[in-house]
Amino acid sequence: VDRPFKEVEANEGYRLSIDLAEQTLTTPGGETFTFDITEHRKHCLLNGLDEIGLTLQHADKIKAFEEKRRQSQPWLFNG
């Protein structure tokens, strides 16, 4: 994948097409390269999530856990 990026640096206006879902990069000449990315990172990028957004997807479970803990260990929450 180094060669296409060298082309980008050397040629103003040079464009690459990146298909994150298929993990491919295509040059203007039609040459295709594959690249690796972790499933976690891919999921976040495809869904526009950062670590906070990813955590907020589980807000209901987090609230349920907190409430259960508040009931089972109320001394932690006094004050």
Swiss-Prot record:
GO molecular function, one term: 3-isopropylmalate dehydratase activity
SUPFAM superfamilies to which the protein is assigned, alphabetical: LeuD/IlvD-like
Keyword Lyase recorded: yes
Catalyzed reactions per annotation: (2R,3S)-3-isopropylmalate = (2S)-2-isopropylmalate
GO biological process: L-leucine biosynthetic process
UniProt enzyme class: lyase
EC number(s) stated in the UniProt entry for this protein: 4.2.1.33
InterPro entries found in the cross-reference section: Aconitase/3IPM_dehydase_swvl
Pathway(s) per entry: Amino-acid biosynthesis; L-leucine biosynthesis; L-leucine from 3-methyl-2-oxobutanoate: step 2/4
UniProt keyword terms in alphabetical order: Amino-acid biosynthesis, Branched-chain amino acid biosynthesis, Leucine biosynthesis, Lyase
Extent of the signal sequence: none
The protein's role, per its UniProt record: Catalyzes the isomerization between 2-isopropylmalate and 3-isopropylmalate, via the formation of 2-isopropylmaleate.
Similarity comment: family membership: Belongs to the LeuD family. LeuD type 1 subfamily.
Assembly, per entry: Heterodimer of LeuC and LeuD.
The name this protein goes by in its record: 3-isopropylmalate dehydratase small subunit
The organism of origin for this protein: Neisseria gonorrhoeae
